[in-house]
């Protein structure tokens, strides 16, 4: 009798634990964030291809796509382009690009996008080919048609304010329902590299609304992870599915943040003695790189600290290569040789440990993430069927 009683107690304890785990998975909000970095977008593209392949394997579904698993996908600059590629619908209302299509896209179009215009005084590239290929690939698709919530940043140089394109903002600000092609060019229009982008939409009253936009990195400084999280948090006010992360309850947040690599040579290149003699011109050449590196580091530090304090460190994964050298550090070197090197960087990164304190490789961590994403999707699907 005692044995039977003990077995029943153990059974109900397991059942309660399982139910609790299921509830957490069901309520979990999933976020994917992709950094900016020009042609270095090849690195996160390799990571996305691996992750999507794992999701297809886990769910035994070759048609599985990243947009099926993430509640919010955000990006800036080249990360904004990747966001659009994996969330913009085709004629069958499925993502027009699989993750495996992204690297070939860079190889086909990168050399034409980063084709020096020959201008000494203007931007390095005229942006015409970039706009042409965006219009060709994304067509007339607008923000509201994205297959999941998106968060793509830009900066308006006329109003001096950041502009964040998301589906959740459209009810209050319908003028933000811009074409994805305009948004992608705008978030990639880095000052000195591409010309700023002008376009117009209509307000709810039918009035003309003008945009004068440059690179989203000006607004979010390359790493859009916090922006993507804030969009997910704001959605909690309107969508019951997001209620679990209200008041920044990161325990129910599953965040994957992909970097485009940092320059290991940068810190070694300059010393205090050397820079003490610098003037405005020398500082202008490196200040943006310094600011982006510092901001990206602080974003990762903040998120890591928050998740660790909540004992939810496995819910956050930052995938970043911190040892880029030579031509791979350049955002606009679209030579075939350099792109091949970037592919190698991405593939080698999968085999590297997540950190000095965590021997788990990125490949292993992404497999774990894929299982969580798959389980959570199944739990939600089962709930919806009742």
UniProtKB/Swiss-Prot annotation:
<dbReference type="InterPro" id="IPR002641">
    <property type="entry name" value="PNPLA_dom"/>
</dbReference>
<feature type="domain" description="PNPLA">
    <location>
        <begin position="32"/>
        <end position="229"/>
    </location>
</feature>
<keyword id="KW-0611">Plant defense</keyword>
<keyword id="KW-0443">Lipid metabolism</keyword>
<keyword id="KW-0442">Lipid degradation</keyword>
<comment type="similarity">
    <text>Belongs to the patatin family.</text>
</comment>
<dbReference type="GO" id="GO:0016042">
    <property type="term" value="P:lipid catabolic process"/>
</dbReference>
<feature type="signal peptide">
    <location>
        <begin position="1"/>
        <end position="23"/>
    </location>
</feature>
<feature type="glycosylation site" description="N-linked (GlcNAc...) asparagine">
    <location>
        <position position="115"/>
    </location>
</feature>
<comment type="function">
    <text>Probable lipolytic acyl hydrolase (LAH), an activity which is thought to be involved in the response of tubers to pathogens.</text>
</comment>
<keyword id="KW-0325">Glycoprotein</keyword>
<dbReference type="GO" id="GO:0004620">
    <property type="term" value="F:phospholipase activity"/>
</dbReference>
<dbReference type="GO" id="GO:0005773">
    <property type="term" value="C:vacuole"/>
</dbReference>
<feature type="short sequence motif" description="DGA/G">
    <location>
        <begin position="215"/>
        <end position="217"/>
    </location>
</feature>
<dbReference type="GO" id="GO:0045735">
    <property type="term" value="F:nutrient reservoir activity"/>
</dbReference>
<keyword id="KW-0732">Signal</keyword>
<feature type="active site" description="Nucleophile">
    <location>
        <position position="77"/>
    </location>
</feature>
<feature type="glycosylation site" description="N-linked (GlcNAc...) asparagine">
    <location>
        <position position="202"/>
    </location>
</feature>
<protein>
    <recommendedName>
        <fullName>Patatin-07</fullName>
        <ecNumber>3.1.1.-</ecNumber>
    </recommendedName>
</protein>
<keyword id="KW-0378">Hydrolase</keyword>
<dbReference type="GO" id="GO:0047372">
    <property type="term" value="F:monoacylglycerol lipase activity"/>
</dbReference>
<dbReference type="Pfam" id="PF01734">
    <property type="entry name" value="Patatin"/>
</dbReference>
<keyword id="KW-0926">Vacuole</keyword>
<dbReference type="GO" id="GO:0006952">
    <property type="term" value="P:defense response"/>
</dbReference>
<dbReference type="InterPro" id="IPR016035">
    <property type="entry name" value="Acyl_Trfase/lysoPLipase"/>
</dbReference>
<feature type="active site" description="Proton acceptor">
    <location>
        <position position="215"/>
    </location>
</feature>
<feature type="short sequence motif" description="GXGXXG">
    <location>
        <begin position="36"/>
        <end position="41"/>
    </location>
</feature>
<feature type="short sequence motif" description="GXSXG">
    <location>
        <begin position="75"/>
        <end position="79"/>
    </location>
</feature>
<keyword id="KW-0758">Storage protein</keyword>
């Amino acid at each position: 009798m005692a044995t039977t009683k003990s077995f029943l107690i153990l059974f109900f304890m397991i059942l309660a634990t399982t139910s609790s785990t299921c509830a957490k998975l069901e309520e979990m909000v999933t976020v994917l964030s992709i950094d900016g970095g020009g042609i270095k977008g090849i690195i996160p593209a390799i990571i996305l291809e691996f992750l999507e392949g794992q999701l297809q394997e886990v769910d035994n579904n070759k048609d599985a796509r990243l947009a099926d698993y993430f509640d919010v996908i955000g990006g800036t600059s080249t990360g904004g382009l990747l966001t659009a590629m994996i969330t913009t619908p085709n004629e069958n209302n499925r993502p027009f690009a699989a993750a495996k299509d992204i690297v070939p896209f860079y190889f086909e179009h990168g050399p034409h996008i980063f084709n020096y215009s020959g201008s000494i005084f203007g931007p390095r590239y005229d942006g015409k080919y970039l706009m042409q290929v965006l219009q060709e690939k994304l067509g007339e698709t607008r923000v509201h048609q994205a297959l999941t919530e998106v968060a793509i940043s830009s900066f308006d140089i006329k109003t001096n304010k950041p502009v964040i394109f998301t589906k959740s903002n459209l009810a209050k600000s319908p003028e933000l329902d811009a074409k994805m092609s305009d948004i992608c060019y705008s978030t990639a229009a880095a000052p000195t590299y591409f010309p700023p982008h002008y376009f117009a939409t209509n307000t709810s009253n039918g009035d003309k609304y003008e945009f004068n936009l440059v690179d989203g990195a000006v607004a979010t400084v390359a790493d859009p992870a916090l922006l993507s999280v804030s969009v997910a948090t704001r959605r909690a006010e309107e969508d019951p599915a997001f209620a679990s992360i209200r008041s920044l309850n990161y325990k129910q947040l599953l965040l994957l943040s992909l970097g485009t690599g940092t320059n290991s040579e940068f810190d070694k290149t300059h010393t205090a003695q050397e820079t003490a003699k610098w003037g405005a011109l020398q500082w202008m050449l490196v200040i943006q790189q310094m600011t982006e590196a510092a901001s990206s580091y602080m974003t990762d530090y903040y998120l890591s600290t928050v998740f660790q304090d909540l004992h939810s460190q496995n819910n956050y994964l930052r995938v970043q290569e911190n040892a880029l050298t030579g031509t791979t550090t350049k955002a606009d070197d679209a030579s075939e040789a350099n792109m091949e090197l970037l592919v190698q960087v991405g593939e080698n990164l999968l085999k590297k440990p997540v950190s000095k304190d965590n021997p788990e490789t990125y490949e292993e961590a992404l497999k774990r993430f894929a299982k969580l994403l798959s389980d959570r999707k199944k739990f939600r699907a089962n709930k919806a069927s009742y």
